Amino acid sequence: MPALYSVDDCESLTTKQVHGLYKDHVNKSQVSLMTSFGFGQELVESAEGVWITQRDGRRVLDFTGGVGVLNHGHNHPRILAARQRFQERKSMEVHKTYFSPYVAALGHNLAELLPGDLNMSFFPNSGAEAVEGAVKLAYKYHGGRRSRVLRADISFHGKLLGSGSLTGQNQSGFQFPGIPGVGIFRYGDLESVRTLVAELRTDKGESDVYAILIEPLSASTMNECSEEFLRGLRELCTAENIVLLFDEIYTGWGKTGTLFHFMRYEGLVPDILTTSKSFGGGKSSISAFVAREPVFRKAYDNLTDALLQSTSTTYYGFGEEAVTAIEAVNVAVEDDYPARARDIERILAPGLARIAKEYPDVVAEVRGHGALHGVFLHKGPKVLELVTKLVPGAMTKDPRFRTKLITSSVVNALYRDHGIYTYYTLNGDNPLMVAPSLVAEPHEVEFFLDCLDKTLAQGLPRLLTRFVKEKVSSLW
């Protein structure tokens, strides 16, 4: 008999054993990287709300928001109950040729909540799949007669071959092949888009662009499109019959203070919206692309395409995933998650502004909305010179390595000294992200601000030196 681990066995594995299994069967380098941080040397016993309890009994305040997944916090009781009810009823998961009441209801709920005629939904499993499904829909809408798709230079739409080629930030430094016909415009620059659209014409003088993708707020860089840009983009796409896609995979379900970020601008409606992450309530791997009815019906409302075979996945619309999303959406609406995000912002924004003013040599800028903010740290000559001295030259081949190291030193200190779990983005200027779940209480936000203040008071040189000496030098 092969020596297989059971679920019970997993729950009794030590940190050392888990590291060993990762080295043998997952990725040895991942162990080297993650053990640079304190949380890479611990295992989690449980998680609830915004708190993580480790095996050693230490409680950690989670201010990552699950990188967009945990608007509802860890293990929301209503979501757990919905999943348990589905399981106890022994409901059917796979609805391929049976109709699913859950898919039907979920599609209805999205249509009720979204503006205009965003009425038609499809439910893949990940954000990247939703983006690719949306792009396919746009291409099919034009019958394959147009060949160009446009994305911004600042963009993150996924890591599959298709969605990866529509992403402006290359996190690995290795270039994979992608879909043909991708054009690039400057984020937030309407004239850049207009110029590109004007250049991309067929021999008949018609537009050759089938879709334009944009993130109204880029959660990976904390850049934001202006209302003027988004409305101008909508006007241009309408005039040229180009399908306009808004990617709100991270920023949806109340995170920035409105149900979706674009909804702060009355009357603004994309042709297709993508969503995922907190759409699954922190327990379900589900996404959606939601299309305006005329766009969807022209592409797929016929017997040949009725099952969307060109874009469907094995697990699309899976029973328990759809049930979880239904409950997640209802919780977000009934508990008014946009208002919760605004309440968090009323504490967080002035608190971060005060810290930035108090430590001008440490904090360069703070940007954000609702419960999603980026703290950009100074990377002046003195700090970069210190990084160069502390770190072996071979490790600086990554052009962003120095900035990552600076932010990592703050992430590590917050965890080590105060039991606060944070992260930094791998794109742009690698800001420290402050992105609590929307169930965070005011006193928890205040506690975070107090701990960030105490951490930054030490100064970047001290934080950097400590981080490198404690963790990095032992590995390199």
Residue map of PLM features:
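Conserved N-terminal phosphate-binding loop of PLP-dependent enzymes in the Aspartate aminotransferase
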Residues: 2-476
